[in-house]
Amino acid sequence: MLLHINPAYLFKLLHGFPPWIMPTDGNLGDKNFQMGKPGHREGATMHVKKYLLKGLHRLQKGPGYTYKELLVWYCDNTNTHGPKRIICEGPKKKAMWFLLTLLFTALVCWQWGIFIRTYLSWEVSVSLSVGFKTMDFPAVTICNASPFKYSKIKHLLKDLDELMEAVLERILAPELSHANATRNLNFSIWNHTPLVLIDERNPHHPMVLDLFGDNHNGLTRSSASEKICNAHGCKMAMRLCSLNGTQCTFRNFTSATQAVTEWYILQATNIFAQVPQQELVEMSYPGEQMILACLFGAEPCNYRNFTSIFYPHYGNCYIFNWGMTEKALPSANPGTEFGLKLILDIGQEDYVPFLASTAGVRLMLHEQRSYPFIRDEGIYAMSGTETSIGVLVDKLQRMGEPYSPCTVNGSEVPVQNFYSDYNTTYSIQDFDWAHCYSDLQMSVAQRETCIGMCKESCNDTQYKMTISMADWPSEASEDWIFHVLSQERDQSTNITLSRKGIVKLNIYFQEFNYRTIEESAANNIVWLLSNLGGQFGFWMGGSVLCLIEFGEIIIDFVWITIIKLVALAKSLRQRRAQASYAGPPPTVAELVEAHTNFGFQPDTAPRSPNTGPYPNEQALPIPGTPPPNYDSLRLQPLDVIESDSEGDAI
């Protein structure tokens, strides 16, 4: 039998070099070459391979126990009370301790479920604390109840006012004929959004009638319609239709006053939308005419200390102590003398008659650098009175997700800002906006969507107000006060002001303290772990280490199961492979002969004794014994030999 040896290994062996340090370039005299010291990279790679080999052998071997042996070992070595008694006592006590262990395990799991569910409910507890320190005075926004001066916008509302007067005549005297009076009216606005009368006496067949009937088309209204409108059960509504007129909705009102006011505001909004905002600012009340006197603490102030903004419903509004460009003003003491005092002229004689039905000042207290939603959160101060407002400060600190759906700055609220795509003028001039807005406003689903989408602020400051009023000025001092104010504003010796146009405000801190209402987690992670550990220790005398032991036994069970499944798959594969061969497996002699038959000569068929040998027949070599497996011929690095031996020992 021939023995094949790699020449490279033989060459290295003859020259006395171990095969793992033999130079690859053949330069044996290189000074940089160091005997017996492999490179750092090769050494690190060898250690990693050895570590992975050990881990692979350990995974293949498994825990080395059966299921029963693992259970017995766990019960005998665990620190949990109960399992050890199951394997150490007699049959009756084993059964008793087994049932007790199951019962207490179920109790622990039940208690754990209650505590985890309570923790995941994200309940909060509220604490109230009172503090004393110098506080920032709130920002004060004031607006006139009338957005514009009627003398400056009268030319814009000429057609609308004439149509409004005709509507009032129809409501007050419907039995009179107004055919001649309505022929000169501009019905272009009316035809798109008219006021109608709805007869609801028959709820199954309600009748809808135009307030003007067919007069604006040159015809007279029937007497039957007049009788219906005079009867009880006839309500006024505003018809809102889409741009193509295919879809219409009716907004009902219980009073004609509400109906005509809302209709007039809607039409006026469309008219004002066609006017540039700068012109609208000039048509509203300027600060130097509205703010007659100002005093904050002991320091005088004027309209220049206010920031002007334009609000669509109230025109020019003025904000004191907004803090956008300057530092917020503090207040160190409570009382009227340390607050803000204002005397305002609302100019009630120049109010728009159909647009502003309330006379007075709309005001709101809010935080610095926050936009005032004065239409929703503001209050009115009546003209001819001195209104004193005492302020109490409440600071609210809510917890965010997952305890409450609050927002810090509103950036995460998923609401599309239409002002980034369309400007305000374009949106209002679209004739279809009223119908769309009315549908959304009356939609219950849309309200629920808004409630779920809009979030309250996590940190908020609320100003609780105590309001008191008194007549101002009194009849005894009315003459000289109005003389002085008229001279200061108009440099006139005559009185240009009246009681119905004057408002005096006093805004101050009622108490020198503030309340902080703060939310905190009612059940935090410390509470949860304490209760879980307490229940586990009380019922079973266990701890976290006992849970780790239980997790270890579960991992061993899974490990053994995987090894058994792999072994089963291998055995099935071997059975399929053996089933594909019909004959018996080859013997050792046949395998040796296959390795020594280098000529690959076919076996000879049996011949009769009369036939002679073939002429070219050659005698086959007699098979010898296989060569011994000498360890000296296994030319491998010593590190590899060590790793193999250690892997076998794992």
From Swiss-Prot:
Chain ranges on the Cytoplasmic side, renumbered to this chain: 1-95, 564-650
Which residues carry a glycan?
N244, N305
Recorded catalytic reaction(s): these are: Na(+)(in) = Na(+)(out)
The protein's matches in InterPro entries, at most eight in alphabetical order, are given as: ENaC, ENaC_chordates
Disulfide linkages recorded for this protein, renumbered to the chain, are C143-C317, C229-C234, C241-C248, C294-C301, C406-C458
**What's an example GO cellular component term for this entry?**
plasma membrane
Q: Where is this motif: PY motif?
A: 626-630
Q: Name one GO biological process term.
A: sodium ion transmembrane transport
The UniProt activity regulation field reads: Originally identified and characterized by its inhibition by the diuretic drug amiloride.
Q: Which family does it belong to?
A: Belongs to the amiloride-sensitive sodium channel (TC 1.A.6) family. SCNN1B subfamily.
Q: What is this protein called?
A: Epithelial sodium channel subunit beta
What is the species of this protein? Pan troglodytes (Chimpanzee)
